[in-house]
């Protein structure tokens, strides 16, 4: 889902940050080729940060955004001050690859409703789905990609399958918090544990949440903000 035209929704979701921060939310560029990779996304964000004349940023990355954030901190250590990595991994793995491969197949075959259903069941925990009966209806309303957007989705999904920077994690200099979810079906919590151990940083695991931990946990943004405001 693209972020253009969603300023009000995003401002509401990130309202806790607005008194302390100027918040920038990045989308991928309009035209991407089939070889588009995480490293390309990192270069684009670094370019934007420099063009905005920003010296230092605190970066919060969720899922694929967490992959981008890791590599940004590695390749541009002078830019990143603090880093929050949410429901993400430093390398592909059989569980994640199986989930993403399934999404790609459904997208390639234009099975949008089945893709929506599978994503809801995989991204959110069963408990959260049970408590929020409106979730599937909301996703059907908001997630209505055109065929060219499905092609885009496939390219972005495939970029995760090729991602592996585990051996570079010791280059991260930024103060880092890793947030994982015990019920994550997309990126198992063991990879959050692995990430925190390799970086040698703080870790927080939410025991009752799924991959969409940033949506499921009511005080998630406050937790992140407290870390970002904490003194070194």
Feature-to-residue mapping (PLM):
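Flexible "cap/lid" loop of the alpha/beta hydrolase fold
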Residues: 74, 81-111
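Catalytic histidine-centered segment of alpha/beta-hydrolase-like enzymes
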Residues: 209-221
């Amino acid at each position: 889902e693209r972020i253009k035209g969603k300023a009000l929704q995003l401002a509401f979701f990130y309202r806790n940050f607005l008194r302390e921060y100027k918040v920038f939310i990045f989308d991928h560029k309009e035209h991407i080729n089939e070889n588009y990779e995480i490293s390309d996304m990192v270069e684009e964000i670094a370019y934007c940060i420099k063009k905005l004349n920003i010296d230092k940023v605190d970066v919060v990355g969720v899922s694929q955004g967490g992959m981008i954030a890791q590599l940004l901190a590695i390749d541009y250590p002078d830019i990143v001050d603090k880093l929050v990595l949410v429901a993400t991994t430093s390398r592909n793995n059989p569980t994640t690859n199986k989930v993403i491969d399934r999404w790609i197949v459904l997208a390639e075959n234009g099975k949008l409703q089945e893709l929506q259903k599978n994503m809801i069941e995989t991204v959110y925990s069963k408990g959260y789905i049970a408590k929020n009966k409106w979730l599937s209806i909301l996703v059907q309303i908001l997630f209505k990609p055109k065929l060219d957007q499905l092609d885009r989705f496939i390219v972005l999904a495939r970029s995760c399958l090729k991602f592996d920077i585990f051996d570079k994690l010791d280059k991260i200099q930024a103060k880092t918090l890793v947030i994982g979810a015990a019920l994550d079906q997309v990126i198992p919590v063991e990879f959050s544990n692995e990430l925190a151990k390799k970086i040698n940083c703080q870790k927080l695991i939410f025991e009752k949440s799924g991959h969409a931990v940033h949506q499921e946990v009511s005080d998630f943004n406050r937790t992140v903000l407290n870390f970002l405001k904490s003194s070194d």
